[in-house]
Regions:
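Helical segment within the ABC ATPase nucleotide-binding domain
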Residues: 154-167
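The feature captures the beta-strand-to-loop junction immediately N-terminal to the Walker
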Residues: 7-9
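Conserved ABC transporter NBD signature motif
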Residues: 30-37
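Helix-to-loop junction immediately C-terminal to a conserved catalytic motif
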Residues: 22
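H-loop/switch region of ABC-family ATPase nucleotide-binding domains
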Residues: 175-176
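Catalytic Walker B motif of ABC-type/P-loop ATPase nucleotide-binding domains
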Residues: 139-142
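ABC ATPase NBD coupling module
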Residues: 38-52, 60, 82-85, 89
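ABC ATPase C-loop
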Residues: 131-132
Length: 197
């Protein structure tokens, strides 16, 4: 498991690098390889089968007006052919219940609650589950605890570490916190003015 921490000041290019890896921004030179596969020319939605992502803003990555279980179902069905079938099967419900239980936030008892009613930390935890549900080749964590209070941020970081370790996920995590970079990463990437130094 490679856990690389990307650090650098504001405007150093950290989020731009993640956006290039995710396919949001095209690159004008070089290649982007994920697990040996050249994804440089693939669009963002084509890369989605390789990448899980959690954003800095807890409001991104989930559909606020949908229920927790519906959000998880969207993530589980990502990359599959679209059908007219709607709803969540009993098997899916049971799977999501067990997944949510591992978070230890009581969300398994609130599966039909709208995601928009959750706290920032609860929402980031659900987003983390959604991003890792399909066992991506690469998990991108873009300052995913920056908008949370210190206690909640610590809990989300612990959950992140647990999920990454259990699923053997290669991860790129952007952080401004050097202590977190050292604690959770096994390699550090320092950026300055758009370059890795």
């Amino acid at each position: 498991v490679y856990k690389r921490q990307v650090i650098g000041g504001n405007g150093a290019g950290k989020s731009t690098m993640l956006n290039a890896v995710a396919g949001v921004w095209p690159v004008d030179m070089g290649k982007i390889l994920i697990d040996g596969q050249d994804v440089t020319r693939l669009s963002e939605h084509q890369r989605a089968k390789y990448i899980g992502r959690v954003f800095q803003d807890p409001m991104m990555g989930t559909a606020a007006t949908m229920q927790i279980d519906e959000n998880l179902a969207l993530a589980a069905r990502r990359g599959l052919p679209r059908t007219l079938k709607i709803g969540i099967t009993k098997k899916e419900h049971d799977t999501y219940y067990e997944l949510l239980k591992t978070l230890d936030l009581g969300l398994e008892e609130r599966m039909t609650s709208k995601v928009g009613l959750l706290s920032g930390g609860q929402r980031q935890a659900v987003t983390l589950l959604m991003a890792t549900l399909k066992k991506p080749k690469l998990l991108l964590l873009d300052e995913h605890t920056a908008a949370l209070d210190p206690k909640t941020a610590a809990k989300v970081l612990t959950l992140s570490e647990k999920i990454v370790e259990e699923n053997h996920l290669t991860t790129l995590m952007i952080t401004h916190n050097m202590k977190d970079a050292i604690k959770y990463g096994n390699r550090l990437i320092m950026m300055y003015e758009g370059h890795i130094i």
